[in-house]
Design a protein with these regions (language model features):
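Accessory alpha/beta interaction modules
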Residues: 7-201, 212-214
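Compact structured core domains
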Residues: 203, 207-220
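Short, charged alpha-helical interaction segments and adjacent helix-coil junctions
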Residues: 5-10, 15-60, 64, 68, ...
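Pocket-edge structural micro-motifs
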Residues: 170-173, 207-208, 244
């Protein structure tokens, strides 16, 4: 497993995600030290080691086209700025702020989490989404994200002409629009004249299947690289190398994996609680309050599940 770090050529100890390794720069790898697997260790310790060894292996196989890794890399302002400069073919673009996994809500309370939300010096807002699954990049989702951005980046009392110019950009593993093009720009037009409507809302699809020798094609090559040494653009390679080879970067990715795992467990428990609440509602013996307390839900959530009584 290649996990280089900032070490001298002599043998040194380092911890990755709580596990002790030794490294020698001559070999540029880590070797775990300590007791052999299974010897004098509790089941909890064995599970901990197994889980983190799995994380280390997964980190080495991560690519920019992978959603969780992409958000970590491009929450860096310099990287997101470079990405947008290439996609929009604008060397003059300067990003003022960038946020990853940015939550937005509509007026009904339904939320969406944007992979990357960036704002440039001219107050133009950019939502960048990575999608390996075709369903996640449906055209109406692009419309939905565009509307959410309008609703969330304006203040009450703002004039319509103060609306930010917005870009929703999907970088997709497959050619969603199926025309064999590297990039698609979607704009509203006036059908009778063919002229642009000019409302300031832009949607762009980038097809990562096209890996030619253009700036965009080389960028898409980088999106499918697992090894930073094989990447074309140093600004991206340096950031990828940090998360794959630097002790702090690897630890950050381990924590990110653990957070995803814990969230999945919470979602699983919540689904079980909802199904149990539905069964109790069908039984008709308990009140909303009793069911809510028993399943760890709110009374409002239980009422919303009661399709039988509300029908």
């Amino acid at each position: 497993m290649v996990l280089r770090g900032e070490f001298c050529a002599t043998l040194k100890k380092v911890r990755f995600c709580g596990i002790l390794y030794v490294t020698n720069d001559s070999f540029k790898c880590y070797i775990k030290v300590g007791e052999p697997m299974g010897e004098n260790k509790t089941p909890q310790e064995l599970d901990f080691e197994r889980k983190h060894e799995e994380y280390l292996h997964r980190i080495q196989n991560l690519r920019l086209i992978d959603d969780n890794f992409m958000t970590k890399v491009f929450e860096d302002k310099e990287c997101s700025e470079f990405l947008l400069q290439v996609i929009l073919d604008r060397d003059d673009l300067t990003i003022r702020e960038v946020h990853s996994q940015y939550g937005l809500n509509n007026i009904q309370g339904r939320s969406a989490r944007l992979d990357i939300l960036a704002v440039d010096e001219q107050n133009k807002a950019y939502n960048i989404e990575i999608q390996r699954n075709d369903r996640g990049a449906e055209v109406r989702r692009a419309r939905y994200n565009s509307g959410l951005m309008d609703a969330n980046i304006t203040e009450p009392g703002d004039r319509y002409d103060q609306l930010y110019e917005t870009y929703v950009i999907f970088i997709t593993e497959n050619d969603i629009l199926k025309a064999g093009l590297p990039i698609y720009h979607i704009e509203r037009i006036i059908q009778e004249t063919g002229m642009l409507f000019g409302d300031g809302a832009h949607i762009i699809y980038v097809n990562s299947q096209i890996k030619d020798d253009t700036k965009l094609g080389r960028l898409m090559q980088d999106f499918t690289c697992t090894n930073p040494d094989d990447m074309n653009y140093p600004v991206l390679a340096q950031r990828v190398r940090y998360f794959k080879e630097d002790t702090k970067g690897v630890a950050t990715m381990c924590r990110a994996f653990e957070e995803v795992r814990e969230e999945a467990l919470r979602e699983g428990e919540r689904r079980k609680a909802i199904e149990a609440a539905k069964r109790l509602l069908l039984g008709g013996k308990l009140s909303y309050e009793e069911i809510a307390e028993a399943q760890g839900l709110t009374v409002e959530e239980v009422k919303a599940l009661d399709t039988k009584r509300s029908a």
